[in-house]
Amino acid sequence: MSNEFINFEKISRESWKTLHQKAKALLTQEELKSITSLNDNISINDVIDIYLPLINLIQVYKIAQENLSFSKSLFLKKDIQLRPFIIGISGSVAVGKSTTSRLLQLLLSRTHSNSQVELVTTDGFLYPNQFLIEQGLLNRKGFPESYNMELLLDFLDSIKNGQTAFAPVYSHDIYDIIPNQKQSFNNPDFLIVEGINVFQNQQNNRLYMSDYFDFSIYIDADSSHIETWYIERFLSILKLAKRDPHNYYAQYAQLPRSEAIAFARNVWKTVNLENLEKFIEPTRNRAELILHKSADHKIDEIYLKK
């Protein structure tokens, strides 16, 4: 961490876990296992030490959002309208964004039992493969130019205004957008938006996605650790793909282990590391909270914007 984070307060895990006094995790070990991504590692103790204090912090921000909305409505002499509380979660490929997002969705559902808590990933706003091929962008998939940012911003605008919104659905099994399939959202109380690009902005857009966020999280780790996690995840995906000839990764499933590792390492260095260093990591100081992971996936440091 550098002077880039002068506006953040660094909090150790030991200090952070004292910010929530309850010892009950609100979910079972089986539930935790079911939402943990391939090769990620999270324990009930992590839920208690890290995520329960985080739920408390989100509640602080939600109350502040509601109070501000109420006061603005009075000032403008307009009817009071409760808007969805939107949480953005960003970080590198293979850093554990999906696990964090699903865990927060579950915990928010448990702590706000009468609330609708939804989750959307920005993968659905990638351009379809055919379009990327036609534009010569398939090898840039995941980079800023491969996303339909206008559609994504329109989606967030509809959500923020309490309107029904629809998001395309992406499948990692086919490595593409699923044709004619949409995920619908009808004015949820909470919306979690997860993706590598949630703090980014293309040059031709005046809006940032983060303009719509009420709270935001960046999952951080040393790039050498993320590389290891990426390769481990790739090998796990290949094991699963052996059982499904229609899976996109089935074409790599018969590679000898050494070749599979070499292939994954090359993809990491030529695609994912470049994307991380040029476009993802430089946006992390836009987050309200940074969760830093050590080599064993455990969150060891927390950075909260002052």
Curated annotation (Swiss-Prot):
Record carries keyword Transferase: yes
Compartments where located: Cytoplasm
Keyword terms of this UniProt record: ATP-binding, Coenzyme A biosynthesis, Cytoplasm, Kinase, Nucleotide-binding, Transferase
Keyword Kinase: yes
Residues that bind ATP: G91, S92, V93, A94, V95, G96, K97, S98
Enzyme class label: transferase
Gene3D superfamilies named in the record: P-loop containing nucleotide triphosphate hydrolases
GO terms for cellular component: cytoplasm
One GO term of the biological process aspect: coenzyme A biosynthetic process
CDD domains (alphabetical): PanK (cd02025)
Origin: domain of life: Bacteria
GO molecular-function term, one example from the UniProt record: ATP binding
Catalytic activity, reaction form: (R)-pantothenate + ATP = (R)-4'-phosphopantothenate + ADP + H(+)
Record Pfam families: PRK
E.C. number: 2.7.1.33
Pathway the protein acts in: Cofactor biosynthesis; coenzyme A biosynthesis; CoA from (R)-pantothenate: step 1/5
InterPro entries noted in UniProt: P-loop_NTPase, PanK, PRK/URK
Similarity comment: family membership: Belongs to the prokaryotic pantothenate kinase family.
Full protein name: Pantothenate kinase
